[in-house]
């Protein structure tokens, strides 16, 4: 009887230890998952990326965005013009856009087209960029096609529609898009738009006051 009690006690102790270890493991995994869902701090490299503003501007704002992302459309229509007026046009900020492709084939096509425009007609890139967001419909549908991208290129750039379509078929600028994907992974970008002000991640992309205060703080620190 005594041996049975001792065995039961040992089993209870072992079971308790196992449960504690499992609970600790779950907590650690959850913490890692929560941390993994946040973009990491640190200034993203904009080498080879589209840039608007003076090269020597003291503050860099980077948008990780997707041309099929509705929230990115809101940022570019409502928030970006304020950044441009208050800081870019005054030489205080340079702005860069990095492609993120969360919405399938259409996202990739748009990214490939934007890379071609940037490489072949950089002066027209931002006009193409703006029109591409404006073209995004209010309802979820597959609207990004080679024909649509060709028409936009024709109306905003010097890139020939037939050349763009041919390069889309061949994925000529795939290496540039893959560089964007590598940067997304490095910065742990899991949501669009993700906005950086130098090495600071903006918590709410739609809060212009947060963006403005962060830029002003960075300017004072320069």
Tell where the protein language model's regions lie, with residue ranges.
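Short, well-ordered turn and helix-capping elements at secondary-structure junctions
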Residues: 49, 99-101, 181, 199
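Structural alpha/beta surface segment adjacent to cysteine/selenocysteine redox centers
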Residues: 65-68, 73-154, 187-190
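Short N-terminal signal/transit or membrane-insertion segments
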Residues: 20-26, 36-44, 121-133
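Generic structural "secondary-structure junction" signal
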Residues: 53-54, 102, 135, 204
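N-terminal, intrinsically disordered, polar/charged segments of Gram-positive cell-envelope systems
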Residues: 32-63, 85
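C-terminal cap of thioredoxin/glutaredoxin-like
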Residues: 1-30, 64-66, 80, 151-222
């Amino acid at each position: 009887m005594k041996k049975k009690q001792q065995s039961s006690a040992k089993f209870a102790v072992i079971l308790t230890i196992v449960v504690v270890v499992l609970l600790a493991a779950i907590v650690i995994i959850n913490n890692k998952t929560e941390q993994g869902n946040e973009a990491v701090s640190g200034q993203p490299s904009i080498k080879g990326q589209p840039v608007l503003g003076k090269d020597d501007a003291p503050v860099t704002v980077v948008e990780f965005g997707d041309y099929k992302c509705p929230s990115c459309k809101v940022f570019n229509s409502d928030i970006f013009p304020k950044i441009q007026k208050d800081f870019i046009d005054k030489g205080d900020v340079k702005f860069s856009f990095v492609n993120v492709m969360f919405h399938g084939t259409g996202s990739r096509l748009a990214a490939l087209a934007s890379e071609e425009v940037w490489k072949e007609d950089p002066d027209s890139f931002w006009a193409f960029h703006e029109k591409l967001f404006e073209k995004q419909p209010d309802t979820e549908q597959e609207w990004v096609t080679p024909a649509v991208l060709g028409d936009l290129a024709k109306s905003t750039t010097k890139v020939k529609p037939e050349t763009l379509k041919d390069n889309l078929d061949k994925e000529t600028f795939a290496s540039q898009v893959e560089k964007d994907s590598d940067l997304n992974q490095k910065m742990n970008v899991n949501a669009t738009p993700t906005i950086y002000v130098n090495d600071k991640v903006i918590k709410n992309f739609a809060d212009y006051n947060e963006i403005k205060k962060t830029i002003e703080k960075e300017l004072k620190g320069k």
